[in-house]
């Protein structure tokens, strides 16, 4: 029995491979918690195997669109704090309070490739990737640790100030979480590898671990997220420069 033309067209639509943008859009549309409070431990290791640890208290709303972080350990970093506010149609706002200097420093778009507090994360790495500010190319699917993945080549638009020429991302097909990312500099050279793990809390994918390898520096940073509290009422007033100088009880 022959299928009608309309059915053939419909079935063809269902099995049509998704484009890179369509996959990115599905990721962008995933639900995020209204707020997230947590503690962050950063463990940094240099080329000689020497490690340094930093402890942070973080609060954010709307999937990290607004976030404030206070450093509580080590003692030399106590009181340093960081504020990030993301915008849809203009550059994100980033400020860091440096108590030893008694001033707030604004992180300009030219400085977003700089290291965040000596770690292998840059200020740019701390921002969500805006869907419409990048081009997405779907590469061949891959399998990592028995996890089937989409692979996307993500390139910032020419007018976007980015320290990367592209990021290649491995996306878990089952839950649309990014589990691996490779970042390339402006010359197309691989400079960072990043790996991520998530937990599912009340139906949300929440980042609980990140590993960042800086190939250029032969340096690495592990990031552990703990004491996760979601959808708690968070006063939006704290996402303001004046609250950078007020460290909450840890």
Predicted regions mapped to residue ranges:
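N-terminal mature ectodomain segment of secretory-pathway/periplasmic proteins
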Residues: 19-100
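Short solvent-exposed loop/turn micro-motifs enriched in small/polar/acidic residues
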Residues: 50-52, 77, 89, 134, ...
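Sec-dependent signal peptide recognition
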Residues: 1-8
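Gly/Pro-enriched, hydrophobic low-complexity segments
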Residues: 17, 83, 93, 107, ...
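Short, low-complexity, Pro/Ser/Thr/Gly-rich segments in the mature regions of secreted, periplasmic
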Residues: 237-250
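Hydrophobic h-region of N-terminal signal peptides that target proteins for export
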Residues: 8-17
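Short amphipathic beta-strand and strand-loop transition segments with alternating hydrophobic
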Residues: 57-59, 137-143, 197-198
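Conserved glycine-bearing catalytic or ligand-binding loops at nucleotide- and phosphate-handling centers
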Residues: 103-109
């Amino acid at each position: 029995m022959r299928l009608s033309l309309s059915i053939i067209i419909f079935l063809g639509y269902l099995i049509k491979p998704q484009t890179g943008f369509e996959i990115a859009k599905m990721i962008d549309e995933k639900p995020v918690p209204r707020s997230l409070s947590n503690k962050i431990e950063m463990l940094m290791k240099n080329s000689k195997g020497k490690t340094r640890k930093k402890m942070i208290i973080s609060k954010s709303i709307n999937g990290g669109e607004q976030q404030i972080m206070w450093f509580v350990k080590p003692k030399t970093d106590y009181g340093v704090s960081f504020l990030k506010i993301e915008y849809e149609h203009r550059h994100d706002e980033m400020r860091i309070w440096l108590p030893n200097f008694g001033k707030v420093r604004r992180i300009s778009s030219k400085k977003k490739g700089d290291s965040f507090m000596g770690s292998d994360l840059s200020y740019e790495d701390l921002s969500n990737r805006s869907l419409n500010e990048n081009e997405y190319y779907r590469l061949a699917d891959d399998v990592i640790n028995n996890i089937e993945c989409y692979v996307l080549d993500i390139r910032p638009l020419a007018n976007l100030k980015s320290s990367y020429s592209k990021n290649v991302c491995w996306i878990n097909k089952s839950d649309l979480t990014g589990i691996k990312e490779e970042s390339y500099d402006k010359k197309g050279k691989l400079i960072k590898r990043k790996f991520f793990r998530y937990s599912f809390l009340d139906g949300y994918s929440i980042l609980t671990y990140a590993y960042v390898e800086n190939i250029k520096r032969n340096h690495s940073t592990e990031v552990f997220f703990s004491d996760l509290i979601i959808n708690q009422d968070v006063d939006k007033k704290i996402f303001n420069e004046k609250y950078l100088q007020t460290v909450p009880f840890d």
